Swiss-Prot record:
Bias type Low complexity, positions: 24-75
Gene transcribed to yield this protein: US4
Region (Disordered): 24-136
Glycosylation positions in this chain: 48, 128
GO BP terms: viral process
One annotated Gene Ontology cellular component of this protein: virion membrane
Location relative to the cell: Virion membrane
Entry protein name: Glycoprotein gp2
Ranges of Basic residues composition bias in the record: 81-91
Family matches, as Pfam families: Herpes_gp2
Known function: The glycoprotein gp2 from the avirulent strain Kentucky A (KyA) is probably non functional since this strain harbors an in-frame deletion of 1,242 nucleotides in gene 71.
């Protein structure tokens, strides 16, 4: 009897050991499958516990040590596949979440799985990498550029550009009085300085030329906003830029002849100072007493004007004789550069004698023809 009971007890123990081994194999396979799913989800851009090592439930000491690996070949493949996904997903060591943070970057179209992003703006892959860094200029030393030009021949337009990041107010002065009453505007913009964008304040002043005297000093002042506008502004507390208003146009010389053909007039405009003038008639150069000249000084809207006049002496017209050319040369000194220059020469031809002689000849011929017709007209017989 005791032998029978011992045999039954051994059989029960064998069945129990077989049951425990099957349970361990099933749990290990389930854990490996979940590990493979975790690796796949990590590569798609989510953070989970795939980077932690895969563990299986503890087994009893009575189970064979190789039952976990030999019970199912899919378990080893699942673990190998999960390890492969963990290697692709990457991740920084010591990361609190264990995996890589692959959230799409706002400045990129598609995220790279091998890049790691953080919120550090100094990092090359930081989120603020696309923002242009504008250098900060000293608020007390702005850079000013001033230019003056002519707009549509009737307006003087001045432009003042101030490179600054501070809140400044721009004031204009022509001579001593301010010009706040005229049309002006201020805009904020960005300019490129040596390939670097900088903030700038641009003020534009537009004044009719009739209200401006050329060669007057114009000043652009960039002042703090707490100063009072107008004549009360202390320019010592501002950053200023000044220049001289140029003439509205370019210097020009023209020769005009009177309707009777007895005078040649040379007019030179847009002069800074009174020039010297010389006349040449054909190959002969006239002396200073051979012509007269009048100087008109600088006035609002115009620079100096020189008018010179030469008397044309009539000569007996002969067929085939060449007409005389009148040459007016004006040499002006530039007060700003102290450079003498010869203005473009103006040529004109006097053909009034030829026209008058031709007209007189045609008239005489017409009269002779009429007289001949009257004399040769047959007379009627009177009975």
């Amino acid at each position: 009897m005791g032998f029978i009971y011992a045999r039954k007890l051994l059989l029960c123990m064998a069945v129990s050991i077989y049951a425990i081994g099957s349970t361990t194999t099933t749990e290990t396979t389930t854990s490996s499958s979940s590990t493979s799913g975790s690796g796949q989800s990590t590569s798609s851009g989510t953070t989970n516990s795939s980077s932690s090592p895969t563990t299986s439930p503890p087994t009893t000491s009575s189970s064979p040590p190789t039952s976990t690996h030999t019970s199912s070949p899919s378990t080893a493949n699942a673990q190998k596949h999960a390890g492969h996904h963990r290697g692709r997903a990457g991740g920084r060591r010591g990361s609190p979440q264990g995996g890589s943070h692959t959230t799409p970057h706002p400045d990129r179209l598609t995220p790279s799985p091998d890049d790691t992003y953080d919120d550090d703006t100094n990092h090359p892959n930081g989120r603020n990498n696309s923002i242009e860094i504008v250098p900060q200029l000293p608020p007390d030393r702005p850079i000013i550029e001033l230019g003056v030009a002519t707009l549509r021949k009737n307006f003087m337009e001045a432009s003042c550009t101030v490179e600054t990041n501070s809140d400044l107010a721009i004031f204009w002065k022509i001579g001593k009085p301010s010009v706040d009453a005229f049309n002006r505007g201020t805009t904020h913009t960005r300019l490129m300085r040596n390939g670097v964008p900088v903030y700038a304040l641009v003020s534009t002043l537009r004044v009719p030329w009739l209200n401006v005297i050329p060669l007057t000093k114009i000043t652009c002042a960039a002042c703090p906003t707490n100063l009072v506008a107008g004549d009360g502004v202390d320019l010592n507390s501002c950053t200023t830029k000044s220049t001289t208003i140029p003439c509205p146009g370019q210097q020009r010389t023209h020769i005009f002849f009177s309707a009777k053909g007895d005078r040649a007039v040379c007019i030179t405009s847009e002069l800074v100072s009174q020039p010297t003038i010389t006349w040449s008639v054909g190959s002969d150069r006239l002396r200073n007493d051979g012509f007269s000249q009048t100087w008109y000084g600088i006035q609002p809207g115009v620079c100096g004007i020189l008018r010179s006049e030469v008397r044309i002496h009539r000569t007996t017209w002969r067929f085939g004789s060449t007409s005389k050319d009148y040459l007016c040369e004006v040499s002006a000194s530039d007060s700003k550069t102290s450079d003498y220059k010869v203005l473009p020469n103006a040529h004109s031809t006097s053909n009034f004698a030829l026209v008058a002689a031709t007209t007189l000849t045609v008239t005489i011929l017409c009269l002779l023809c009429c007289l001949y017709c009257m004399l040769t007209r047959p007379r009627a017989s009177v009975y």
